[in-house]
């Protein structure tokens, strides 16, 4: 009998699942939407922690084994817009740690509602652990396509232009459905692109016909590579890639999308794979993402052996 490699199910090309996923502890409850940065010889992971409605921090060296969680930013019920905070991006710049995050306000009675409002907030830290936030959001939903929700900021510092660049998701409350773009000189005052949204669902691709959201942008080889979630419907999601010369226009989708989709029956990520974060380390590409089974999301690791992820882009 031929044995099937279960780590390869739902993975394109040289991608595979780490065999002992999920990588964060079960007793932490639901964790999701991570940012990973390298500081010296250590990796720092910032994550959304569902049971506390907070953003937490862990450290490690190999991308698999992590320290205990430390909450770095908690909800602030006095501001009126961040009863729940999550979906963060953290940059280290000029000796400071800069964080943009999603603040959510639920409308109506009950702990979880199907409607609400979300904005993007900003905080700074000297050590990456103790953050001081601005009281007001730095970006709010204003345009028709944004509806009442902005989420999932991804920010890069453009050294050549001396400017911050943000890609963000907007639209639906639980899962924003399109991706927009904005620029800022100080990371606080943002100007949205006049042609937003810059990236939309593709109705001819069943795996991303409903929603595209929560991207990471990775500059490489003269392109801006976008790793993003594509939704077939509200419950089934995959990881996909597109690229653009300027990160705004002319997006070209990877012809072998999706690169990651649900795992084998009964596995922790059988129904959906969400919110990618990719990093190159030791001759491999590491991609952390949320997997979902039933209503539970957990963070796992996917590995690409070899340096060239897209050698078959034009095949």
Task: Show the residue positions of the predicted features.
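Carbohydrate-active catalytic/glycan-binding domains of CAZyme proteins
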Residues: 1-315
């Amino acid at each position: 009998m031929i044995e099937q490699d279960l780590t390869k199910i739902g993975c394109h090309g040289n991608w595979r699942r780490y065999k002992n996923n999920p990588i964060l502890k079960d007793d932490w409850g639901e964790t999701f939407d991570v940012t990973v940065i390298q500081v010296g010889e250590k990796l720092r992971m910032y994550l959304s922690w569902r049971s506390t409605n907070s953003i937490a921090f862990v450290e490690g060296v190999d991308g698999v084994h992590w320290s205990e969680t430390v909450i770095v930013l908690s909800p602030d019920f006095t501001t009126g817009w961040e009863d729940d905070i999550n979906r963060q991006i953290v940059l280290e710049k000029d000796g400071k740690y800069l964080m943009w995050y999603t603040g959510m306000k639920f409308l109506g009675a009950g702990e979880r509602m199907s409607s609400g409002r979300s904005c993007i907030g900003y905080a700074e830290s000297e050590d990456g652990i103790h953050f001081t936030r601005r009281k007001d959001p730095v970006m709010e939903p204003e345009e028709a396509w944004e509806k009442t929700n902005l989420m999932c900021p991804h920010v890069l510092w453009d050294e050549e232009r001396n400017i911050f660049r943000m890609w963000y998701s907007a639209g639906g409350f639980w899962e924003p459905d399109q991706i927009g773009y904005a620029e800022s000189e100080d990371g606080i005052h943002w100007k949205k692109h006049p042609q937003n949204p810059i990236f939309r669902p593709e109705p001819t691709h069943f795996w991303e016909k409903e929603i595209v959201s929560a991207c990471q942008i990775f500059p490489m080889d003269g392109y801006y590579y976008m790793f993003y979630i594509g939704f077939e419907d509200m419950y089934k999601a995959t990881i996909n890639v597109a690229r653009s010369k300027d990160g705004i226009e002319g997006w070209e989708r990877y012809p072998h999308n999706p690169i990651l989709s649900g795992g084998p029956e009964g596995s922790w990520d059988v129904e959906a794979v969400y919110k990618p974060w990719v990093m190159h380390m030791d001759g491999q590409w590491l991609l952390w993402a949320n997997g979902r089974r039933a209503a539970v999301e957990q963070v796992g690791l996917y590995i690409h052996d070899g340096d060239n992820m897209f050698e078959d882009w034009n095949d």
